[in-house]
């Protein structure tokens, strides 16, 4: 999601998973013997390890299905894969891409070509466990099903902050009352700083006006009060207006107690805490309205060669057992609703287990970051 998914390094990668045989469908009607399924997954390099060492071995044990995984570095060819799926549909051919994980906006683009299978509880039982109002589900027009996610949350040092802010306005007030003890990273270098910027913009313009596929630069006039607000905070930011480069730099400032509060990625914060790279006094909490976040969504082409196998695999991936692996390995959010997760997992994520605000689309993101640089970072005090 972002400068993304998280010391978990944020690069994009692809996996191709070939399922050699299928013996059963988890809540999906049998369609005879299924020869295989090819799955492309975009994500970080740690996603490869999760599939290779955890998910696929468990899947094989539970289904007697043999799998093969091919890892393609850095997510090369995401758009060409979409073009390949569209081309096959236009020529009336099947595609060997049975499952495709990509940005929800790509899925939305493909939906206009009629290339995706609409996934519901009628053709995949565990689809009922996914919140239909999740931002990425809405952006992908219901054709994309999330199986993992993450959001930006508020990190604070409980040794110095006894009662953390629970709203964005309370954060703004805290910053002014505690000069020098808060910062956020340059939005051009990290997703957590961008989230702090986007929620400020959403104070003066509706999130839904900027998160869809349409783009109207004239709407950006609504952002001016937000940019003025962020500029007014500059003298209260750490080191008189220092915005570090990257998510890691913010976590390091928190770890050294140079600052007491900052927005961070939920999975990065949890990962640092688990590794002892942040003091135990650092706590994570989501605020209202929530910071932005994102899901990794999977779609199944309507003309996939092994569509039934694809539905089976995705349905298995949305079981509570598989989702627990995803959450624990990535310190992120499950694709299914939290209420379907084991109690110990819910307890671990109690402070941040909420929905997140949608991201602006790519054009608005680029404009917002440019305007922040011009009118906030580049301005005087």
Regions found by a protein language model. Give the residues of each.
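Alpha-to-beta junction loops
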Residues: 65, 90-99, 115-116, 178-181, ...
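Mature extracytoplasmic/periplasmic domains
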Residues: 291-360
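Early extracytoplasmic/lumenal segment of secretory-pathway proteins
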Residues: 33-105
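A ligand-binding cleft/hinge motif common to bilobed small-molecule-binding domains
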Residues: 107-109, 261-280
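Periplasmic-binding protein-like
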Residues: 150, 227-233, 277-302
């Amino acid at each position: 999601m972002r400068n993304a998914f998280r010391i978990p390094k944020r690069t994009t990668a692809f996996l191709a998973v070939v399922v050699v045989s299928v013996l059963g469908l988890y809540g999906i009607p049998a369609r005879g013997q299924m020869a295989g399924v090819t799955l492309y997954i975009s994500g970080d390099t740690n996603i490869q390890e999760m599939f290779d060492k955890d998910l696929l071995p468990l899947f094989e044990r539970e289904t007697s299905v043999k799998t093969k995984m091919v890892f393609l570095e850095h997510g090369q060819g995401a758009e060409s894969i979409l073009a390949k799926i569209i081309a096959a549909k236009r020529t009336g051919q099947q595609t060997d891409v049975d499952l495709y994980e990509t940005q929800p906006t790509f899925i939305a683009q493909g939906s206009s070509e009629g290339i995706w299978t609409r996934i519901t509880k009628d053709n995949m039982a565990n689809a009922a466990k996914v919140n239909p109002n999740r931002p990425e589900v809405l952006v992908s027009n219901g054709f994309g099903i999330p199986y993992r996610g993450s959001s930006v949350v508020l990190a604070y040092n409980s040794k110095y902050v006894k009662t953390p802010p629970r709203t964005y306005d309370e954060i703004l007030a805290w910053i002014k009352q505690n000069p020098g003890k808060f910062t956020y990273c340059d939005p051009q270098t990290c997703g957590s700083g961008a989230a702090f910027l986007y929620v400020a913009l959403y104070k003066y313009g509706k999130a839904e006006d900027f998160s869809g596929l349409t783009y109207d630069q004239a709407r950006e006039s609504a952002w001016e009060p937000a940019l003025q607000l962020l500029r007014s905070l500059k003298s209260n930011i750490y080191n008189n207006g220092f915005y570090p480069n990257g998510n890691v730099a913010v976590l390091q400032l928190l770890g050294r107690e140079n600052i007491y509060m900052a927005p961070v990625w939920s999975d990065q914060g949890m990962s640092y805490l688990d590794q002892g790279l942040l003091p135990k006094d650092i706590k994570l909490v989501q605020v209202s309205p929530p910071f932005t976040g994102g899901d990794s969504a999977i779609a199944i082409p309507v003309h996939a060669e092994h569509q039934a196998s694809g539905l089976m695999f995705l349905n298995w991936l949305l079981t509570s057992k598989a989702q627990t692996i995803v959450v624990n390995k990535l310190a992120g959010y499950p694709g299914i609703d939290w209420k379907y997760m084991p109690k110990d997992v819910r307890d671990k994520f109690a402070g941040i287990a909420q929905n997140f605000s949608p991201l602006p689309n790519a054009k608005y993101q680029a404009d917002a970051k440019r305007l922040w640089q011009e009118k906030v970072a580049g301005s005087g005090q």
